């Protein structure tokens, strides 16, 4: 995950999005596939975590809470990670709203994606069998005066400590273990992610 902000537009917005047509008492109504799934309380977090994508996810979480504060929300994650600040806006909203947010990893949940996966409601965090999960420490690159570089270096150390502390809470691992295991890129299979405490179960088929 990157301490620096990234404002790249998500590629999913540039792709051709399928439409779904439904028959209603007033005739036909069409939705793009993501809007239709949103009606079923399904949110997709795909691609790099950046400000634009985070704002969309946060808006959907808040909307679904207003629709029904007592019904679970399902957050499907396929992400290589991205901006810490963007990711934390999603994480804080997940913890803030009343509905439980069930997280599901499909494909990969790396860096900030893994952090958000682990931040789902206890007992409702899942991974598909051939997905991978990766945790590591925040990344940062700075230019400028030495005093400014020192300020940013201290800030990234503060963020690292905060993320490790939260990850320890969500996984049940000791903080010292988290600090050691996030020192470098640490890839896990679906089963390994369950053993580590990042998720609660591997989903092979729907019940």
UniProtKB/Swiss-Prot annotation:
Domain of life: Bacteria
Active site annotation, chain numbering: 111, 136
Disulfide bonds: none
Pfam family, one: CLP_protease
UniProt xrefs under InterPro entries: ClpP, ClpP/crotonase-like_dom_sf, ClpP/TepA, ClpP_His_AS, ClpP_Ser_AS
EC number: 3.4.21.92
Cellular location(s): Cytoplasm
GO BP of this protein: protein quality control for misfolded or incompletely synthesized proteins
Transmembrane segments: none
Example of a GO MF term: serine-type endopeptidase activity
Gene Ontology cellular component terms for the protein in this record: cytoplasm; endopeptidase Clp complex
Subunit structure: Fourteen ClpP subunits assemble into 2 heptameric rings which stack back to back to give a disk-like structure with a central cavity, resembling the structure of eukaryotic proteasomes.
Family that this chain belongs to: Belongs to the peptidase S14 family.
Main function: Cleaves peptides in various proteins in a process that requires ATP hydrolysis. Has a chymotrypsin-like activity. Plays a major role in the degradation of misfolded proteins.
Protein's UniProt name: ATP-dependent Clp protease proteolytic subunit
Native source species: Aliivibrio fischeri (strain ATCC 700601 / ES114)
